[in-house]
Amino acid sequence: MKTKVLFLSAILASVTLNSVAHSAVFNLATEKQNIELNQSPKKIAVYDLSILDTLNALNIQAQIVPKATFTGSLTKYNQAQFIKAGSLFEPDLAQLKQLKPDLIFVGGRSAKTLESLQPIAATVDLSAKTDHYMSDLKNRTLTLAKAFKRENMAAKKLKDLDQLQLKVKEQTANKSAVMLFAVGDNYMPHAANDRFGFIHELTGFKSVLPLTEKTDTARPEAGSAEALAAEKKNVELLKSAVQQNPDYVIVLDRGAVNTQKYASKQGIKTHAVLGQSQAVKQNRVIFVNADAWYITGAGLDNTAFMLKEIA
């Protein structure tokens, strides 16, 4: 009888230990990857600011980040206590080997480095898909929340974001806009399916441009016949947008990244095409924060910030 009791006790102890061990396992599953660790990661490296922004929003702190200018809710990462290893495009492999992170995140600009990082530590690609902006943001947020046990916090943040978006869409109902990406004196209109065209899904502004026909053609070399043809097409597209008389012109000024110096605020007024638009003449122009829209992008807190710029 005593032997049987001891045997049962041993089984129960084994089950308990296995349960504890299993509950300690960290699991992060995406469509393409399934990351499993024996414990929750203590040293995290992040090479995409939209991911860093979402982690930060969920009170999950990275220890290793790229050399970059951190703004907004990410300003603290400028501090020396956070190790800088590589850039947003190229993580420093040698430095990471010495630092031995438990988990590495890549996405967007750094996504191509996934395979080179995997021998160093578990690495996951959480690149944003802005062609379905909000659903993708929610999926990536919930993926992180589940892995790091932040479900309640994520649910509240996402609910607040939904309410904010609804408020913005109430204000933009039946209003149109053209999204412009400005590089110097060159203003490039972005249709709803272009890189920054997600603003239409995000804010509810109707686009005045037709959807762009997508190609795999590389950007033409400056000064080439192809580049001149593309420039001419761009001017025609601008003229077409102005003729549609958009209620608002929205400008993302590349030159203001890391400087917050918006030369386009003056340049747009004297632009041969845009200067003739009613939106510009009547000061219905929104210059969005260049760091937020161009560098940080589709993060949880940053998306709320971007919506508030339009509200």
Question: Which stretches of residues belong to each language-model region?
Answer:
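Bacterial Sec-exported substrate-binding components of ABC uptake systems
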Residues: T3-V5, I11-L12, T16-S50, N152-G184, ...
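A short, structured surface patch at a secondary-structure boundary
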Residues: K43-Q98, R109
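A short, acidic, amphipathic alpha-helical segment used as a generic capping/interface helix at domain edges
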Residues: K232-V242, T270-A272
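Short helix-initiation/N-cap motifs at beta->coil->alpha
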Residues: T30-K32, A85-L93, K214-T217, G223-L237
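Proline-aspartate-enriched helix->loop->beta-strand connector
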Residues: K97-V106, A122, A241, N245-V251
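Structured C-terminal subdomain patch of bacterial secreted/periplasmic proteins
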Residues: S135-D136, Q244, Y248-A311
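Alpha-helical, coiled-coil/dimerization segments enriched in small aliphatic residues
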Residues: T69-S73, A192-E231
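Extracytoplasmic substrate-binding proteins
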Residues: S116-Y187, R284, N289-A311
